[in-house]
Regions:
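Short beta-strand edge/turn micro-motifs at domain boundaries
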Residues: 13-14, 29-34, 125-129, 141-173
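Surface-exposed, charged secondary-structure patches
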Residues: 94-140
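Short, solvent-exposed secondary-structure junction/capping segments
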Residues: 49, 68-86
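Hydrophobic alpha-helical membrane-insertion segments, chiefly the h-region
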Residues: 20-30
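Hydrophobic pocket/interface hotspot
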Residues: 70-71, 78, 95, 128, ...
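Ser/Thr/Pro/Gly-rich low-complexity linker/stalk segments immediately outside membranes or between
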Residues: 30-47
């Protein structure tokens, strides 16, 4: 006659092994998978979009942190290709001046980056493709929503991924 308790005892082992495998999978995801170069570049682009956003009640301290975050996302020098408004090579000083003008003209802005695709060229270089959306209001009361396809080149400098160039293309919407 078979012992029914042996079946339950074996079931506890199987359950414990499955639980340990699930815990190992979760640990792997948080420890390794979220730190891949592709994930780090995607997070950097999302952080840049967040820093470019602005609300009407934003404090000076928050604004300074965002300006620092924006400037820190780019290599020095970097190249920008956005219509006739912002085109050419930017060193750190020129980039900070442009960020200051942007923030002074805008009273409210919601900037998002979506459909981020990273193509690793080698361990230190990557191309990033995404859609950028600006929905905002200028201080003169004009408002607009702009959607662009963006191609960026990223370079890894001192272990951090920085944007070396950005090219904007118009999108029909």
């Amino acid at each position: 006659m078979k012992n029914p308790h042996k079946k339950i005892y074996l079931g506890k082992y199987i359950f414990t092994v499955l639980l340990l495998l699930a815990a190992a999978g979760v640990w792997y995801w948080y420890a390794v998978a979220g730190k891949s170069d592709e994930a780090l570049i995607g997070k950097a682009i999302a952080a840049l979009a967040s820093d470019l956003s602005k609300n009407k009640q934003e404090s000076t301290a928050t604004a300074l942190l965002k300006v620092k975050g924006i400037a820190g996302a780019f290599a020095d020098p970097m190249t920008l290709g956005m219509d006739q408004y912002a085109f050419g090579s930017y060193d750190r000083e020129r980039l900070l001046a442009s960020i200051g003008r942007y923030r002074a003209m805008v009273s409210r802005a919601e900037v998002t980056a979506s459909d981020i695709t990273v193509e690793m060229l080698d361990k230190e270089h990557a191309k990033v493709y995404f859609s950028g959306r600006f929905a905002g209001e200028l201080k003169n009361g004009m408002s607009d929503t702009i959607v662009k396809d963006i191609e960026a080149e990223s370079v890894k400098i001192d272990g951090k991924w920085l944007i070396k160039s950005m090219k904007f293309r118009s999108v029909l919407h």
